[in-house]
Amino acid sequence: MKTLALQLQGYLDHLTIERGVAANTLSSYRRDLRRYSKHLEERGITDLAKVGEHDVSEFLVALRRGDPDSGTAALSAVSAARALIAVRGLHRFAAAEGLAELDVARAVRPPTPSRRLPKSLTIDEVLSLLEGAGGDKPSDGPLTLRNRAVLELLYSTGARISEAVGLDLDDIDTHARSVLLRGKGGKQRLVPVGRPAVHALDAYLVRGRPDLARRGRGTAAIFLNARGGRLSRQSAWQVLQDAAERAGITAGVSPHMLRHSFATHLLEGGADVRVVQELLGHASVTTTQIYTLVTVHALREVWAGAHPRAR
């Protein structure tokens, strides 16, 4: 194995063993660093000790530009900034371990992303989406019951899709109407669950899950696929897409849009931004405050259309 490949693997091992980085995050780092490794090798660099600050800066430029010849798409500012985080971590590790004399990525600044407001659904659209999933008839099968429970839980708790499909049976208490979510970095938070979501979960756990569980090997996962294994993020995404299509919602709907809707509707209902921060599992209230801009934007539109001196 080449020196550069060994150095990259050493950093990934460090993230796994010593830092306990989540599997999804590790997968993203591996993908970004593979791209960085290719960038360096194309310049004849096979050792981190030979990398200069300009090599890192040029990598960032290449990410934003893309490469039509190789079919590599240009990355957004957000995606490029994420890739730079992985590269910075690599060079910080290299300097600390004596693999390189200096941390050459330290001074490279990430691109500034445009401040786009997160898209959310209206309350009526969410209700149509949930009803489109079915699960409210005695004749509904186990997969329909599961689909309704997944969507109700996502909207009721604001959970990330990975948090929802990662739930085990011990993580939810339908009597106390609460669920234990495991977020980024292994951080846990106890979140209340609304009554409609509890009803959907009870229906699935009693009438749906046992049938699915008999097809599998005894996993503790709450949400099971048709073969009795843990439901994947991709399959949960498809559940949402199918429900949106049945509800006649033409705009692209993603699991994160339900999370955005959860936060926006809470703030519109008068919830304190720091409470929403805790419910979402954000490390900083600054991340949550983007949703306050959504509600202010909606108020501004109403004001502009109704106030005689708005124009």
Swiss-Prot record:
InterPro entries: CB, DNA_brk_join_enz, Integrase-like_cat_sf, Integrase_catalytic, Integrase_recombinase_N, Integrase_SAM-like_N, Recomb_XerD, Tyrosine_recombinase_XerC/XerD
More info: Was identified as a high-confidence drug target.
Catalytic residues as annotated in Swiss-Prot or TrEMBL: 160, 184, 256, 259, 282, 291 (o-(3'-phospho-dna)-tyrosine intermediate)
Signal peptide range: none
One Gene Ontology cellular component annotation held by this UniProt entry: Holliday junction resolvase complex
Subcellular location: Cytoplasm
Family statement drawn from the similarity comment of this UniProt entry: Belongs to the 'phage' integrase family. XerD subfamily.
GO molecular function annotation: DNA binding; tyrosine-based site-specific recombinase activity
GO annotation terms (biological process): cell division; chromosome segregation; DNA recombination; DNA transposition; resolution of DNA recombination intermediates
Domain of life, per lineage: Bacteria
UniProt keyword Iron present: no
Oligomeric and partner information: Forms a cyclic heterotetrameric complex composed of two molecules of XerC and two molecules of XerD. Co-immunoprecipitates with DarG in the presence and absence of darT.
Segments forming domain Tyr recombinase: 116-304
Name of this protein: Tyrosine recombinase XerD
Coarse class of the protein's main subcellular location: cytoplasm
Domain Core-binding (CB): 2-95
Protein role: Site-specific tyrosine recombinase, which acts by catalyzing the cutting and rejoining of the recombining DNA molecules. The XerC-XerD complex is essential to convert dimers of the bacterial chromosome into monomers to permit their segregation at cell division. It also contributes to the segregational stability of plasmids.
Keyword annotations of the record: Cell cycle, Cell division, Chromosome partition, Cytoplasm, DNA integration, DNA recombination, DNA-binding
PROSITE patterns: CB, TYR_RECOMBINASE
